[in-house]
Amino acid sequence: MIMNKMKNFKRRFSLSVPRTETIEESLAEFTEQFNQLHNRRNEDLQLGPLGRDPLQECSTFSPTDSGEEPGQLSPGVQFQRRQNQRRFSMEDVSKRLSLPMDIRLPQEFLQKLQMESPDLPKPLSRMSRRASLSDIGFGKLETYVKLDKLGEGTYATVFKGRSKLTENLVALKEIRLEHEEGAPCTAIREVSLLKNLKHANIVTLHDLIHTDRSLTLVFEYLDSDLKQYLDHCGNLMSMHNVKIFMFQLLRGLAYCHHRKILHRDLKPQNLLINERGELKLADFGLARAKSVPTKTYSNEVVTLWYRPPDVLLGSTEYSTPIDMWGVGCIHYEMATGRPLFPGSTVKEELHLIFRLLGTPTEETWPGVTAFSEFRTYSFPRYLPQPLISHAPRLDTDGIQLLSSLLLYESKSRMSAEAALSHPYFRSLGERVHQLEDTASIFSLKEIQLQKDPGYRGLAFQQPGRGKNRRQSIF
């Protein structure tokens, strides 16, 4: 009798003292309870109206009876059989959320997903994966809220938006579809290239939404672009910041060129910058995948001010050096605060180039006289001028790098990969060369922007609003 009293006392005492439970124990208990309820529901569903088990009734029916081999069951039958066998686990939720992009879903959404959407025990097929993403909200226009109109171009309108899934800001590039022509080739090209580019210095394509009337590209949102940055620092950048932006530009471009992709439209408006100072290549509408060392392309590419002389003269055979000339022009513009060759026509653009670098000859540019445009224009014989007199804020290494990019003969221009190792960037340290592709240069504590001498304040916040946003991503 005394033993019974002791047992009752221990039981009451244990019930009166709250028990500390670990997160792992709570999750394990939750999982077990869910599985019990799930199995009980399956048992109820499996019992027919007369208390019979429909699976037992069907057990005498084999796949071979219908002429189907076991491996040839319809997807619906296979799915139903897996439904009756699957169990929920926390690992399933993790697998379900292994998305092809860096995304953080709200906690309440994860809880809802745990309760309502258990996963299959086998790895998801491509079709199932797409269906899974669609269930979450990807590929649906209603997932995004339009906030401000950033600009409008010939084929597209760009909006600042917000994702209902993550609450993050996004840029919605809405491309109008003409029923006679379908999606513009520039949009198709941009999507096909960007979906395979994962780099810290290349804008991320988060989602793609296709409706009858439009094709919407959902990009990560960045507050400003390089042109706006220059405007808001009074066109007077810190030379340290010039170096950091230049390194990021080359880093993203080297990644593209390594994958045989030419951007073909480099300009400050297409280099987006966020509040952290991360610079990212954007607007791949004119970009091309290059499968051979040289190939014939259109010469109507690259904004006039950043177009290399060989393309200006009508060359349609080019490779990665087409982008490197533009890099040189952008480097000069950051260092001086003004465009290097602001021509309004092709002839004027060539005139400005020749006046600074000297009129080319067969000795300085083999094959130049073969261009009919060069013979037709009959340019004066200009002598080359020293670049240091036009960009005095650049140090010796900076001038040497600039000179190696602004070369007439395209094959002689320094590559993006080689430029990253130029002595000009030595002051950034060695660790910048050891970063993973998706790691930001600012993940290194020694890399920080300095205050620009001409800084006017709010350099990042104001440009991204309303009509002041440059129409740079159409």
From Swiss-Prot:
Pfam name, any one: Pkinase
GO (cellular component) term, any one: nucleus
Region (Disordered): 44-87
Keyword Repressor: no
SUPFAM superfamilies: Protein kinase-like (PK-like)
Residue(s) carrying Phosphoserine: S14, S74, S89, S98, S117, S132, S440, S443
Transmembrane regions listed in the UniProt entry: none
Enzyme Commission numbers on file: 2.7.11.22
Gene Ontology MF terms in the entry: ATP binding; cyclin-dependent protein serine/threonine kinase activity; protein serine kinase activity
PANTHER family, per database record: CELL DIVISION PROTEIN KINASE, CYCLIN-DEPENDENT KINASE 18
Protein name: Cyclin-dependent kinase 18
Organism field: Pongo abelii (Sumatran orangutan)
Gene field: CDK18
